[in-house]
Amino acid sequence: MSEEIHLSVDAMGGDFGPRLCVEAAASFIAKHSNVRITLVGDKAAVSSCIPPQADLSRLHVLHADQVVDMADKPSHALRHKKNSSMWRALQLVADGEAQACVSGGNTGALMAIGCHLLKTIAGIDRPAIAKQIPTARGSSVLLDLGANLECSPQQLFQFGLMGQGLARVYGKSEPTVALLNVGSELTKGNDIIQDTAQLMGDCADMHFRGFVEGDSLYSGEVDVVVCDGFIGNVALKVSEGVAKFVFGDLRSRIGRGVRSRLLAWLAKPVLKPWAEQFRPAKYNGAALLGLKGVVIKSHGGADAEGFEQALYVALEQASAGIPLKIQASLAAMLGAGLETK
């Protein structure tokens, strides 16, 4: 990653305003000498958050008068928020001035403005939110995580193609794909799931492995798991909630008495790396796959460490040229007519 990468950041997005975004950006450029960041937002508010030790030669502020609120409808943001921090951060990518954009703001607006400014890759109807999730065998790609609450079989099929392309970039030479369903039997699922399975199964360029159930999501049985945005977002939020409950309950039990604290001290060499593996901040940052540019969605409630991880995902995907690789992969398959088996 020696080539300079320019990242744009919607500094006004997220639940906590610019402070955490700016803190994360300053920390990130200190660790990555090939990165410069443009923080987009209210200049006075953003500038006041920049720590005195920050490298100002690689950390810039671009003023934007408006903010896309979490309550804004995507259509409203498209019509009335053209001078917002989100719009201007995405515009930098569209103009070729930045290689990636990171925002913790309104997901629907981010997708709508992203589609308007960056456009979608040929052969893709709508982008999907995708991210790597930890599994028993390393990691898998899960999509869609909330960009499209309802999907046609053709769109779900396209998600599978994009997820497969992303998995290849992450080192899976022949990634396997499955649909998230209410059962693993071939007869399970509604008409949309059944029709999607038919499309995937008939595609010689896709290593389709049928269905996976929710309890197998983290097994690592397949490399790519596809679902609509409603199901994907619920699955992700439930997973986050379970993780918080388990770790919270474990902490409370460890603190109950001398014996528990002693056992915790003895088990620390095992518990510490185990807990580290499943920290939410470690997996923050999901890509809007299908756009002609790298756009990373950070969790709105992420802390500075989590936002810094989203910046790393942006750097990683910009350096790897993810959109171009997915576009080339899709073009090759579409050019071959997506041969059937």
UniProtKB/Swiss-Prot annotation:
Function: Catalyzes the reversible formation of acyl-phosphate (acyl-PO(4)) from acyl-[acyl-carrier-protein] (acyl-ACP). This enzyme utilizes acyl-ACP as fatty acyl donor, but not acyl-CoA.
Name under which the protein is recorded: Phosphate acyltransferase
Catalytic activity: a fatty acyl-[ACP] + phosphate = an acyl phosphate + holo-[ACP]
Pfam families reported in the protein's UniProt record: FA_synthesis
Protein EC: 2.3.1.274
An annotated Gene Ontology molecular function: phosphate:acyl-[acyl carrier protein] acyltransferase activity
InterPro entries attached to this UniProt entry: FA_synthesis, Phospholipid_synth_PlsX-like
HAMAP family (UniProt xref): PlsX
Assembly notes: Homodimer. Probably interacts with PlsY.
Signal peptide: none
Recorded family membership: Belongs to the PlsX family.
Gene3D superfamilies in the record: Isopropylmalate Dehydrogenase (3.40.718.10)
Cell compartments where the protein resides: Cytoplasm
Keywords: Cytoplasm, Lipid biosynthesis, Lipid metabolism, Phospholipid biosynthesis, Phospholipid metabolism, Transferase
Originating organism: Saccharophagus degradans (strain 2-40 / ATCC 43961 / DSM 17024)
Taxonomic lineage from the root: Bacteria, Pseudomonadati, Pseudomonadota, Gammaproteobacteria, Cellvibrionales
